[in-house]
Amino acid sequence: MYPAHLLVLLAVCVSLLGAASIPPQPLNLVQFSYLIQCANHGSRATWHYTDYGCYCGKGGSGTPVDELDRCCKIHDDCYGEAEKKGCYPKMSAYDYYCGENGPYCRNIKKECQRFVCDCDVEAAKCFARAPYNDANWNIDTKKRCQ
């Protein structure tokens, strides 16, 4: 084998090892981001919702700071109800449709998938209706979310 071929083979192997160490994004959260984009017609990137208020993003505590944060709390509570039913909301893939009037769940026969899709669609529509206050992005949750 030629030395150049060995270098290419080595580079491919190293690349594959690096890719294998990247944790996968739960499929449902990817779908949820698409639903948000569908509901708000692409007017705000989904990362704006990952660290907003007391409930948008990982975890949550205290009193929601505004209407948008209440949408996130309701979504968190909905996922909590899904877990009580034995569902895995962050891993449940489902079929949805993005129409002129926003996202809809479609052709879902399994109870968990339907429940989680409904949680996500309602949250995405709530996000689209709620005003976005830049002052509530990346807040100090230790002070404001008691």
Curated annotation (Swiss-Prot):
Where is Ca(2+) bound in this sequence?
55, 57, 59, 76
UniProt-annotated location(s): Secreted
Spell out the SUPFAM superfamilies in the cross-references: Phospholipase A2, PLA2 (SSF48619)
Gene3D superfamilies (alphabetical)? Phospholipase A2 domain
Q: Please tell me in which tissues this protein is expressed.
A: Expressed by the venom gland.
One Pfam family assigned to this protein is Phospholip_A2_1
Positions annotated as propeptide: 20-27
Identify the InterPro entries for this entry. Answer: PLipase_A2, PLipase_A2_Asp_AS, PLipase_A2_dom, PLipase_A2_dom_sf, PLipase_A2_His_AS
Which residues are annotated as active site? Answer: 75, 120
Alphabetic keyword roster: Calcium, Disulfide bond, Hemostasis impairing toxin, Hydrolase, Lipid degradation, Lipid metabolism, Metal-binding, Platelet aggregation inhibiting toxin, Secreted, Signal, Toxin
Q: Which reaction does it catalyse?
A: a 1,2-diacyl-sn-glycero-3-phosphocholine + H2O = a 1-acyl-sn-glycero-3-phosphocholine + a fatty acid + H(+)
Any one GO MF annotation of this record: calcium-dependent phospholipase A2 activity
Give the EC number(s) listed in the UniProt record. 3.1.1.4
* Lineage: superkingdom: Eukaryota
Enumerate the PANTHER family for this protein: PHOSPHOLIPASE A2, PHOSPHOLIPASE A2 FAMILY MEMBER
**Similarity annotation:** Belongs to the phospholipase A2 family. Group I subfamily. D49 sub-subfamily.
The protein in question is named Acidic phospholipase A2 S5-32M
Q: Which organism is it from?
A: Austrelaps superbus
